[in-house]
A protein has these predicted regions:
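Conserved nucleotide-sugar donor-binding
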Residues: 1, 75-89
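Short acidic donor-binding/metal-coordinating loop in glycosyltransferase active sites
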Residues: 1, 9-11, 97
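Short aromatic/hydrophobic "clamp" motif used to bind/position activated sugar donors
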Residues: 4
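Acidic donor-binding/catalytic loop of UDP-sugar-dependent glycosyltransferases
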Residues: 8-24
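Catalytic donor/gating beta->alpha subdomain of glycosyltransferases that bind UDP-sugars
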Residues: 25-59, 93-94, 102-167, 233, ...
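Loop-to-transmembrane-helix entry motif
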Residues: 68, 142, 172-176
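Membrane-embedded multi-pass helical conduit in multi-pass membrane proteins
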Residues: 171-253
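Membrane-proximal intrinsically disordered regions of secretory-pathway and membrane-system proteins
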Residues: 256-263
Length: 263
């Protein structure tokens, strides 16, 4: 078959989803078309709202990358259609085959799009712990792909390099940037202990690390503050990305993973 649809088993698609995916392939230059994910919040006691917000913004970025550059950087693995000629053998122990195939489409100078009218529905992860494990696995898979496709930053034209760097690589660098900022703030304060500015920076850095603990305490008291929960979600996902990087450095031994428990 010329077009293959990849879909997760836990996905429910809107009735016209396949038609919306297929219509973009009238353009022979299109190699992949991805759907967007919609979630409903059944239980907002943990990080469901924050994950829903993240997925919504991520979908908007992917849609506009396709419209502006013809280069959606990484289709949602939940549901996408791809020309069969771009489906290649996935390397052993690879964790993010959807991202691998998406970048392969761009490497072949084909267009990668996201159609906002192709909609699928998926339940949100049940807890922060579940999403943490998933993001850690995704992070390790992202670095696997980066090792293979980093050349896209300079060997292809800017339509691929710009969104790849600004959307993905900058995000993957964020744990290291945060860690560097913390270390530098400590060093600067040690060098200039009387500096008001360095004291302020250090206090702000310390507050960023303490706020997630405040959210944990408030949650146990059945108090939910959305901004605090969002901040805890942000810090937790960056820790997960860093640990995923460590997993990649150590070497991924298997691509078998336990499905995420969802609401």
């Amino acid at each position: 078959y010329d077009i293959v649809v990849m879909m997760d088993a836990n996905i429910i698609s809107k009735e016209n989803c396949l038609i919306e995916l297929a219509k973009y392939f009238k353009n022979e230059d299109v190699g992949l078309v991805a759907a967007v994910i919609e979630n409903s919040v059944k239980d907002d006691t943990d990080i469901a709202k924050q994950e829903q917000y993240y997925i919504k913004k991520e979908s908007q970025i992917k849609v506009h990358e396709g419209l502006l550059f013809g280069a959606t950087i990484g289709a949602f693995g939940a549901c996408y259609a791809i020309r069969s000629k771009y489906v290649k053998t996935i390397p052993s122990n690879f964790l993010m085959e959807d991202f691998y195939l998406s970048l392969n489409v761009l490497e072949e100078d084909a267009i990668c799009m996201t159609n906002p009218e192709a909609i699928v529905y998926e339940d949100l992860p049940g807890t922060l712990q579940e999403e943490f494990k998933r993001k850690r696995r995704i992070s390790a898979g992202n670095f696997q792909n980066l090792k293979i496709y980093i050349h896209l930053l300079w060997t292809k034209n800017w339509r691929v390099g710009l969104p790849f760097f600004s959307h993905k690589i900058l995000r993957w660098m964020s744990p290291f940037l945060i860690l560097t900022a913390i270390i530098l703030s400590c060093l600067l304060l040690a060098m200039e202990p009387n500096s008001f500015f360095y004291r302020l920076v250090f206090i702000l850095m310390l507050a960023n690390l303490i706020l997630p603990l405040v959210d944990i305490v408030l949650k146990r008291m059945n108090i939910s503050v959305n901004l605090l929960r969002l901040h805890r979600y942000f810090i937790s996902m960056n820790i997960a990305m860093f640990l995923g990087f460590i997993d990649w450095i150590r070497g991924v031994k298997t691509n078998i993973w336990k499905p995420t428990e969802r609401l």
